[in-house]
């Protein structure tokens, strides 16, 4: 029961994070998703230090990325053996089911999830009816705090 409640809470936080990320003002459009689309998104950020940049892509785009000739040649066949999404230009690529038609090149400074307090768990048991009640509460805010640190990647219409 608690495992399911935790998953619901994590899914809500993920949805809130994605909703804030979609407010990004920087945008890079592409004809076909792959190495060039990500590199253009990185360039759009115009950062001197790219060490904290990462890319978040929809799960469905992993295959396109793995088939990209630039990606395959950069990994020198390694992708065939380890099966990971990997890195592009030394930047980690993360895939998620929470995205469907948009990817993001960003740093952790772009979107913040600020917790007011840790998750609070309360439980109660009615001894006569043998009913247990468990309530989880959390208070947080998720916000796009630095729009210069996130670039939305979308396909040309």
Where do the PLM segments sit?
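Long, contiguous amphipathic alpha-helices that act as assembly "spine/axial" helices in icosahedral shell
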Residues: 1-28, 46-49, 55, 93, ...
């Amino acid at each position: 029961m608690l495992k399911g409640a935790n998953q619901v809470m994590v899914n809500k936080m993920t949805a809130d994070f994605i909703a804030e990320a979609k407010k990004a003002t920087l945008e890079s459009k592409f004809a076909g998703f792959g190495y060039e689309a990500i590199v253009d998104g990185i360039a759009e950020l115009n950062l001197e230090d790219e060490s904290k940049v990462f890319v978040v892509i929809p799960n469905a785009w992993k295959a396109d990325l793995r088939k990209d000739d630039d990606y395959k040649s950069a990994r020198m066949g390694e992708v065939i053996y380890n099966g990971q999404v990997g890195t592009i230009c030394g930047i980690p690529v993360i895939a998620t089911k929470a995205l469907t038609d948009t990817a993001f090149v960003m740093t952790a400074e772009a979107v913040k999830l600020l917790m007011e307090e840790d998750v609070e768990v309360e439980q109660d048991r009615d001894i006569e009816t043998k009913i247990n009640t468990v309530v989880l509460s959390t208070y947080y805010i998720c916000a796009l705090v630095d729009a210069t640190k996130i670039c939305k990647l979308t396909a040309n219409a």
